């Protein structure tokens, strides 16, 4: 999913460079995002192909890190615009009233706040490296609870519920199927089997499966579907507990008179062309 970034900067954390820090429309828009490389690439292409090349910078963060910044910094955050898990945006808006009402129409089946427009919907799935499954004579899991089996110990990668929204998909499915207490017990054993492969990034389990470092992971379904279609030794299982989904949305920071008007225009561009 990663591509060379010729005109934008993506950093793992820290402060953005080239921020707008003012209302002039000639200043670059600072975009904070928790999105994976593939989604960022789509947003970049939308902006670059519609007149906004060299007018923005992207700064990447883990979900929990960016969520913490939104809650702690509110309107004082350096970003002009964010793309983020919708439930985090809702929490930040409820606490800080920090987002502008979007000034363009947003057509959705579900109801969203007038400050956020969904850009992606993501589902979780069990991912497998079929070559490694055969090599180590591992049976294919059919449900999330199967990931607690001892045969998978050392062959499993998972995301950390403290840092990745992808782990939220796993946790919600477990709670729905087994209740909160049993879900915690199941998750604890899954983490034991994952060992050193409890990852911060939602795409990390797939990347590890793709690289042949682990045989099984829990990650984003659409990424596994794409890898399988491209002929990689990747397959996926929709767990019997169900596929939960979450949305990622775009929002514009309300900086009052210092709000850069390009932020709304770029948000609309991402929605219409991303």
Predicted regions located by residue number:
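Short amphipathic alpha-helical coupling segments at ligand-binding clamshell hinges
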Residues: 42-43, 182, 186, 248, ...
